[in-house]
């Protein structure tokens, strides 16, 4: 949400699409974080309808760069086998539809994916090869000084360096980057 707010504040046209939370929950979080830039929000799970919504938002503000934020990939359905059939293959086909849409319209997508109980990316490994960057967010459980902080790491980046690590603390108004020296 903070990223969607920042992108909108910097002149972007952003749709935050979630099936993980209700729009009411999303609104409450936006208010708590005091996000002010008014990005669009939706709850579409069917990718063809989602992309139609994207077209409408892009047409309303054609001069602004468009960013689609999806929370999460595993809740989307490409519609190939009906509206209620969601599985790993559905996620692959949905991601393919989104990446093809972005390539053909010069839009950008940030797709949030789920993880398994042991912290691995949910779904097939092919998903990693379909994206330009893979960024993980985890909870620090080993270092006593950073216990409970979030670790943001780049695992893959086609356009720059990977293996970058950032430590984030969760504050009342969202994430705040911290350095190891600031917590000791």
Model-derived features: where do they sit?
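Aromatic pocket-lining residues of Rossmann-like dinucleotide-binding sites
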Residues: 7
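Conserved inter-motif catalytic segment of the P-loop NTP-binding fold
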Residues: 2, 10-100
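Phosphate-binding/switch region of NTP-binding enzymes
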Residues: 92, 96-184
